[in-house]
Amino acid sequence: MREKILFTEEECKWLLTHAKEYSPSTVSYDIEKKSNLTHIHNSKDRLSEEYGLGKPEGKLASFLLEKLKPIGFINLKGTFLNYLRYYKGGFFAKHIDGPERHKTCIIQLSSQDNYSGGDLIVNNEVISKKIGNTVIFSSNTYHELTKVKKGIRECLVIWTKKGNLKERKVLI
């Protein structure tokens, strides 16, 4: 796991503006054939919202690729973006991402002054809440978001498939 502040506050605001143009997506899990399980991710009661931004294209793709090159992203082919907004009470229980995913990248978009709680924990390590902080880790690593106690926490999540992230000994 590696983390580094890669985005300025202004760039995070730009990403938020772009993300908010999309409609919330439906979160579905194949656990017991149920959808929107509130003990995993409470999007059903709208304490969190997930926006599937799909494959990055145009200005967004160019911008993200340029900013993420220092941590090994050589292209965005085969990647998928999600914008997540967590309100008071919102959380995402400890989990690993789907088997088709190779790397997970999470960009902190909201200021740590805008919310309390909502700690991102990756492999039992609490990740910095500084705006623009970017963390990348193997998608088969356990991670979670603790319950937001007040305010709103926003982030952008990018997943890659194998072959889309240039592996280096020192990514950050």
Task: Please describe what each predicted stretch is.
Residues 1-74:
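Non-heme Fe(II)/2-oxoglutarate
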